[in-house]
Amino acid sequence: MTIEILTEESVRRLWSKTYNTLGKPDWTHLFPYYSPNIVFQDTIQRIEGKEAFMAMCGRMAHRCSSLNMDLLNVIQKDNVIMLEWIMTMSFTKYPSTPLYGSSRLTLNEEGLIIEQRDYYDLWGDIFNNIPYFKRPYRKFVTKKFG
C-alpha cells in the first residue's frame, strides 16, 4: 500500500476524517502513517510500539460515548508537524469535556510518524466541568501559580 507524504495539508485532511458525525473516531486510515517503533507520550502515559498505540486508541474510543476534534492549526517545519486542537470527549455519566491541546508529530527518514507527543492540561480542563472540584481547583491554581 502506497501512502501519501505527510504535509500540513495532508495531515489536516487525514486527521479531519478521523472523527465522524456519530462522534466515534476511526483511526484506521491513520495507522499506516505510524512507524512500527512509534513512541507516543502525553500527560498520563508513554506507549512504545504500533500495536500498543493502536490498542490505546481503541480503549479511548471505547470509553467515550463520543469523541470529536477540531483542528485549529497545522504547521510543519522540516520533519516536525504541530497540530493545535480542541478535543471534546463525552462520557455516559458526565458532561462533555473539551480539552485544549497540541500534538507534535516527528517523522522518520521514511516519512512515518516515529514520535507523537501530546500536550494538554488534563486536570484543569476536566476539573472545570466537575461541579465540586471546579472552584477549589481554580482557587488552588490561582493561589499557587498566580
Q: Which role does the model predict for each range below?
A:
Residues H62-N68, I75-G146:
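A beta-strand edge to alpha-helix "cap/lid" segment located at domain peripheries
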Residues S10, A52, T97:
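Soluble or luminal CAZymes and related metallo-dependent hydrolases
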Residues W15, Y34, C57, W85-M87, ...:
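Hydrophobic alpha-helical core bundles mediating ligand binding, dimerization, or RNAP-core interactions
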Residues M1-T28, P32, K144:
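Short, low-complexity N-terminal intrinsically disordered segments enriched in polar/charged residues
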Residues W27-F31, S35-N79:
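A solvent-exposed, acidic/Ser-Thr-rich amphipathic alpha-helical stretch
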